[in-house]
Amino acid sequence: FNTNINNIRGFFEAGPVDSRQVFEVVPLKNNMVKLKLSEKELVDAVKKGAKSFIDSGNKPGIVIPSGLKYTVSRQGELKAMSFVDKNGKETPIDVNNPSATKLYTVATDDFFASGGDNLLPNKVQSKEYDEIFDFDKDKLTCDYIKKQNAPIEIKDDGRITIVD
């Protein structure tokens, strides 16, 4: 799953979470989209997002990925990136020469997939997607929380590292 930081408008306090709080944190109603992105498109999106470190007015800010781990400098440079599989195994990605042919399946929202904030080319308009779903990430988040039926621990898992 990929999103940009500007889609998140708050945080969860410790304690019970209800759907109203989910909708406050992620208030934008965007349908989920499944598509394939090349390694190069992923690297380019993270590089563009990292530029917000040198220009605070630069939208969209950093990219928040699931399945990717990366290091950026406060000068806006992408230093390292790797793909992390479901078992936690990391595979390095060459950020200086990413593959234009190696593809990753990504779930994101239609704003991001449509080139919103200029991080990606418009994959929706060009019909370069696998599926557009008739629900948004708020519903997915609520469904996930309900399915857990137990407290959820939110912790820093080290996916994004910022260095001087």
Describe the role of every protein-language-model region:
Residues F1-D164:
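Catalytic centers of hydrolytic enzymes
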